[in-house]
A protein has these predicted regions:
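Radical SAM enzyme [4Fe-4S]-AdoMet core and its adjacent flexible, acidic
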Residues: 1, 116-118, 122-246, 251, ...
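Alpha-helical membrane-targeting segments
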Residues: 1-27
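N-terminal pre-triad scaffold of radical SAM enzymes
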Residues: 17-52, 60-65, 241-248, 258
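Canonical radical SAM enzyme core domain
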Residues: 43-51, 67-109, 117-122, 130-136, ...
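Acidic (Asp/Glu)-rich catalytic clusters
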Residues: 53-56, 84, 103-110, 141-146, ...
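Short, surface-exposed connector motifs at secondary-structure boundaries
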Residues: 58-62, 82-88, 149-153
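Hydrophobic residues within beta-strands of alpha/beta enzymes
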Residues: 62, 90-91, 113, 180-184
Length: 258
């Protein structure tokens, strides 16, 4: 799977700035709930001030999710404004309405249409369909690929998810020739009983190794706490410049594998 060099550089710089505390309050990735920004029945935003705050965000990546963003008439305008401001956008959707609304978006290098796949999710039976993905989502992915869009799949794992089910989703993603894959724990599972939470974390880490890209693995780790709304972790006060330089060099080494 491919990982944009520009995104690699932006995330590396954001992580270094965060560890050096040059950008207080900023994360490499910021979550945006479409329902808090856009009206469900109008293309106008709820607040122009909120739009300005989002566009002015110091986070290089904005992840738009929440209740289905494609339900909002103004989502394409919001995405266009954010990408034009220099941010990368991951627009998460179930994919059900993707084919219907794909014509409203522009296939730019800073936009990843991100289709969420969950094992065990209801879907119509079809001989050409793998478990965990609806036919409409698959059709949407194919239509987006043909239109030149970058596609990422977001695989969410729950405690009951079997690795065999997750493997089928990975196989589906590769068969559709997607550009990237993010794997995270399902929302709401971070507060499970400790043994269950540890088992899920271990299962998620194991699944990420199957992505085949250290950069998409890294992005998965960065995205997960943002999606789960976990508190931001702060670097140790004793973090040295030498240690940060070593991490930066390790990041640079990883570029050649992207």
């Amino acid at each position: 799977m491919r990982f944009p060099l520009r995104l690699t550089a932006d995330l590396t710089m954001a992580r270094l700035a965060q560890k050096l505390r040059l950008r207080r309050g900023a994360r490499p990735i910021q979550f945006v709930d479409a329902a808090e920004i856009l009206h469900p029945d109008s293309s106008h935003p709820v607040s122009h001030e909120k739009i300005r705050d989002i566009i002015g965000s110091r986070s290089p990546v904005l992840w738009i999710g929440g209740s289905e963003p494609l339900h909002h008439p103004g989502i394409a305008h919001l995405v266009r404004a954010i990408t034009q401001s220099g941010h990368f956008v991951f627009l998460e959707t179930t994919g059900t309405f993707l084919r219907r609304r794909i014509h409203e978006f522009q296939p730019v290098s800073r936009l990843f249409l991100t289709v969420r796949l969950e094992s065990g999710a209801p879907h119509r039976a079809s001989s050409g369909l793998r478990p965990g993905a609806s036919e409409l989502a698959v059709e949407g992915i194919r239509a987006a690929r043909l239109s030149g869009f970058l596609i990422c799949v977001h695989v969410r794992l729950a405690p009951e998810t079997e690795m065999s089910d997750a493997a089928k989703l990975f196989h589906l993603a590769h068969s559709l020739d997607v550009d990237g894959c993010v794997i995270s724990r399902a929302c709401g599972e971070s507060n499970s009983a400790l043994p269950a939470a540890q088992a899920l974390s271990q299962k998620t880490a194991e699944a990420r190794k199957r992505i085949g890209s250290i950069w998409w693995e890294s992005l998965s780790r960065l995205v997960e706490p943002v999606l789960l709304r976990e508190p931001r972790s702060q670097p140790p006060t004793g973090t040295s410049a030498v240690h940060l330089e070593h991490e930066a060099r390790a990041d640079e080494e990883g570029i050649k594998f992207a």
